[in-house]
């Protein structure tokens, strides 16, 4: 199987909406190459730690690289994406450029590694690729060593970052945690680094479970995290203090009632993967079953909600 890399050079004002369009149409990740990064210090408040190469960036504007399965990326999808992008009010149509190339599966398996470097994902957590070395910058820094494989997120998506921030705030060592749709296992590992002793990681995809187990081994917690295939919380009988779910909004909506029933009194439901257009519906459903919304984060068109199970 091959992949189509759709490359688009656009103005800065259109980046957020264009990225959402690409992701909503099934892109398996979007790489953002911003010409401003060559001018400004490559360091944000969490500290990026890698050198930038001029040849990787456009002369002006922003290059977005989106990756689509060649079998599903046809003329209709190509035109639909182009039409939606060209209809954006924020887009400077005089300076937009489109190009495509085919990337072989063997190349794709390693191509994404060129864009994955150690980075601070939140106040405490730093994500470190398994093939790179990294020295902690502070004693309180918690490092997650990750080899997500090409099918799973690297931790730099806004939804993951927001979940990590919520874990920092609400998860305590004495809590028990269930991570639904664990993927690479990053949120389970974060809970372990906080000091949690009882963690269960579920994913309907057995490949995800395998990847997660390998990442648990890399972080020396494979014996402390139970990683198993599972269909959301439908068959879960054990109670937990924390339910974490960073998955798509329609799946979150399907599991809200089960999340409430799985939680101990006073427990927290940390959930993201919600686009801003759908978060009010998710929030209303959570409140309807008995959750009190105690935290709401927004980042680049995505939302993370934390609901607490409270007494009537």
Curated annotation (Swiss-Prot):
InterPro entries: Ribosomal_L11_MeTrfase_PrmA (IPR050078), Ribosomal_PrmA_MeTrfase (IPR004498), SAM-dependent_MTases_sf (IPR029063)
Any Gene Ontology CC annotation: cytoplasm
GO molecular function annotation: protein-lysine N-methyltransferase activity
Positions bound to S-adenosyl-L-methionine: 160, 181, 203, 246
Keywords attached to this entry: Cytoplasm, Methyltransferase, S-adenosyl-L-methionine, Transferase
Catalytic activity: L-lysyl-[protein] + 3 S-adenosyl-L-methionine = N(6),N(6),N(6)-trimethyl-L-lysyl-[protein] + 3 S-adenosyl-L-homocysteine + 3 H(+)
Any Pfam family: PrmA
EC number(s) from the headed UniProt entry: 2.1.1.-
Subcellular location as annotated: Cytoplasm
UniProt function note: Methylates ribosomal protein L11.
Protein name per Swiss-Prot or TrEMBL: Ribosomal protein L11 methyltransferase
Gene source species: Staphylococcus aureus (strain MRSA252)
Recorded name of the encoding gene: prmA
